[in-house]
Amino acid sequence: MGVSVIDDTHLQAATSAQELVRVEGLRKTFHSGSQEITPLDGISFSIEHGEMVSIVGPSGAGKSTLLHILAALDTPTNGAVYFGASSLESLSETELAEYRSRAVGFVWQRHHLLPDFTAAENVAMPMLVRGEPMGQALRAAYDWLSEVGLADRAAQSAGELSGGEQQRVAIARALANRPALLLADEPTGDLDERSAENVFELMTRLHRSHHLTSILATHNLSLARRTDRILVLDHGKLVPGVDGLRGSAGSTAAYPAGTEAHISGDLG
């Protein structure tokens, strides 16, 4: 590919386009012994710039697999993912590494912080990997910790923080390189109800203030309903009539018949 999708000009072009992410005919299969597993089975959808979209569905529906492919942490068996006008498949390994570190931020269910490092050092890690000087990275990390309400915890070891605080640090780390696309895989799954609510409110505020495009996989239906749209995955497919369902942040259209069973049934 002649020009990187993530140089300044092309990143700006991708994020100013109405459609930031497009998925076409995405299929993922792997083998477990003699059995073929298909976590994603030919799904297609698009996400507009600035949307906050939730993905819900039963365990094993393909939510995590989808996010990993969108983050270029896994590759599809068939189909394509586009970031702006560029297909991820067309990117070189160097460009994919830049895409992962610059265009995308990822929040995991388990925060994956380094427990013996301070909160600020954890947030600074992505910037250090990109070659920023230590002092500059730590100053930026402090600013991000201030945004998530943890400026007073900057010098504290990550392992000493509460679960909700650790996830706030993880969110700050995911945003440290100022990505256009934020992916979150069950970011509130390990938290109590109050902490989950606080973390979701924080993500919503940051989504708006930093003009992010956010995709959230969650089992929490009450949170999903507060995003702009809900996509329901079941057995690797988008549920017909539910793709594009509006959450309360969008229109107040009624849920299609049977939707409640899909999104509030066995999501464990």
Model-derived features: positions:
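ABC-family P-loop ATPase nucleotide-binding domain
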Residues: 1-29, 240-268
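ABC family nucleotide-binding domain
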Residues: 19-226, 230-235
